[in-house]
Amino acid sequence: MLVSHVFLLTLSLSVPSLGQYEHWPYYPEYQGPPEPPPTQPKIVPQIHVRLAGEKRKHNEGRVEVYYEGEWGTVCDDDFSMYAAHIVCRELGYQEAVSWSPSSKYGKGEGRIWLDNVNCNGRERSIASCSSNGWGVTDCKHSEDVGVQCSDRRIPGFKVSNELPGHLEGLNIQVEDVRIRPILSAYRKRVPVTEGFAEVKVQGSWRQVCNTQWSSKNSRVVCGMFGFPSEKKYNTKVYKMFSSRRKHTYWQFSANCTGNEPHLSSCKVGGVLSPDPKTNQTCSDGAPAVVSCTPGRAFAPSPGTGFRKAFRQEQPLVRLRGGANVGEGRVEVLKNGEWGTVCDDKWNLVTASVICRELGFGSAKEALVGAQLGQGMGQIHMSEIQCNGFEKSLTDCKFNIHSQGCNHEEDAAVRCNVPAMGFENQVRLSGGRHPTEGRVEVLMERNGTLRWGTVCSETWGTMEAMIVCRQLGLGFASHAFQETWYWQGDINADDVVMSGVKCSGTEMSLAHCRHDGANVNCPRGGGRFAAGVSCVETAPDLVLNAALVEQTTYLEDRPMFMLQCAHEEQCLASSADRTSPTTGYRRLLRFSSQIHNNGQADFRPKTGRHAWIWHDCHRHYHSMEVFTHYDLLTLNGTKVAEGHKASFCLEDSECEADIQKQYVCANFGEQGITVGCWDLYRHDIDCQWVDITDVAPGDYFFQIIINPNQEVAESDYTNNIMKCRCRYDGQRIWMYNCHIGGSYSTETEEKFEHFSGLLNNQLSTR
């Protein structure tokens, strides 16, 4: 029997008297350090911690603490790595990497809550560490402390950004909530959409009485389990079923308004007194039933029981840059152009409107500070205020002006999604860490479910990304075609899946195209079985389209000045027949500026030992294919292409306060840092397309970054830039340059037929 669960949670409730209401604060439980925790003080105030300030990554920032209804900072006096570890663990990271004094991440505002913090490293909260006391300090905000946490998350840790209440009185703990399917039609259904609402108290599951249960309560529970709304159910069937069973009821009731992101945010409806005659807590009622409506991506379909791939069909709102289904940076469509949302006043209620609009449940995290990467283009909405019942984010109140906002404040969300059980159909075996290993899948062969390996012949980054998504481990950092160094399960050595090819939208590896039962793997499994390595964050490369449009020009260059480029095959094949003394080549030249807007540095796939030295450029190239430069006819036929042999990756320039890390000279480390860009100027060798043989006409000019997807990115849709191009034999006009995915389909089609031009004259050098 299938049962929907949520992760362990603790609810602290206050019930002063029957008929009065109090809010339920929410305490996420997570795995603490391996050492046994010390004896906690009798009273440890409930706080929330966040990383704020001038930061570039989600796992670093100024430490801020929410206490007594107000956010405040922590002074750097006596702060240590022990304290940094506590802060990071409290936020769900396994450990701290470093801490920074003297307001490295900017000066905070308001109170300085803690000073002279002294931790031993085993506390569960910074509130348990010794200090001068709350608000007792002689510090200034120039001494605000910051931390950088490890990328690795604590397994199973769930974040709630609901602010805690301030309660006194009776302490009641609820350990878990579930929907338990009762009718046979729902017991084998995936996902579980209907059943009794039950809570776990002191290790035992108990039903919730329906005498004070409402559809608003059901809406909240459905949202917790990844469903956008509740629906009616057959009350007669459940009444008949309930009368035949003895039930153990929870002695409390809940009173939700319907817009809460979690049952823990609802109010306590009162204590249910037992009937004096029957001694039953719910003698006049029955167990509360919850029936949910799944979103499009999770609705049952004939033959499979679920959709094979998640395809975003919502025309007004989308999520970008997330590792998993139901998470990402929020983008909205306005006047045909996609733009982001500023995180001012961003909260779970507003985030839940987006999640439900996209067919998911309520929001489990409302993320601020571009935690899932920075977007591009306009910021369309700011200071959004929703009541939680809107059909679309555009129905909420918001400020159309975004003064003071920038893409460092892009809002993001993680939604509750239905439990499909996909994570139980694949595993990683033999790796040094839980995030890497040989891929083993559970497949039906000859009527029996068995574990086996995946043939690596067609294995690449996109397939590895699906595995990491399926396991909830983030993005793929590497896709391995040899795994002899990982000793997997000896009983799973046989190849059970081959010919795997994924598009990137699938929710599990089984949804990708593959050979099915007709496994064909000439190279065999064993050392050639597929493997992956997963990471929580990924880079995101975006080309500056405006710069390409502004710097494009034609140059007639003599062949004797192109000797090095000719040797590197940067010219069209007809250059082999061109006179080296009197001939020339017509070059379409331009500058390209490639930004890393993601959450991790972009690093070449190959190690330093495989880099190639280029005499002409006098440095090593780390990627053989980093970009494609193509000139296409209007029907997509390629008529000319750039032949830039390979690339050296470095930080040409960076945003303010970001240090360059990568440089090509002197065999330096190569890559592109988050917040930096690599500039290829129009006047360097091979930064062109040889159009000597191209006839006059209208064309598309296209640039694709990381075309073979050798390096994993959080978003590949923005790796393509396309321009309209008109060439009359002597002059060229480049116009309507834009990044893939930045406009609606309708607007994209208009661009392809728009005739606005920029005049770029012929240059002779």
UniProtKB/Swiss-Prot annotation:
What does the record's cofactor remark say about binding?
Contains 1 lysine tyrosylquinone.
Which UniProt keywords are given for this protein, alphabetically ordered?
Answer: Basement membrane, Calcium, Chromatin regulator, Chromosome, Copper, Disulfide bond, Endoplasmic reticulum, Extracellular matrix, Glycoprotein, LTQ, Metal-binding, Nucleus, Oxidoreductase, Repeat, Repressor, Secreted, Signal, TPQ, Transcription, Transcription regulation
Q: Where 2',4',5'-topaquinone occurs, residue numbers?
A: 680
Please provide, in alphabetical order, the Gene Ontology terms of the cellular component aspect for this entry: basement membrane; chromatin; collagen-containing extracellular matrix; endoplasmic reticulum; extracellular space; membrane; nucleus
One GO BP annotation of this record: collagen fibril organization
Where along the chain is Cu cation bound? 617, 619, 621
Catalytic activity, as annotated: L-lysyl-[protein] + O2 + H2O = (S)-2-amino-6-oxohexanoyl-[protein] + H2O2 + NH4(+)
Q: Which SUPFAM superfamilies match?
A: SRCR-like
Recorded protein name is Lysyl oxidase homolog 2
From which organism does this entry originate?
Xenopus laevis (African clawed frog)
What's the name of its gene? loxl2
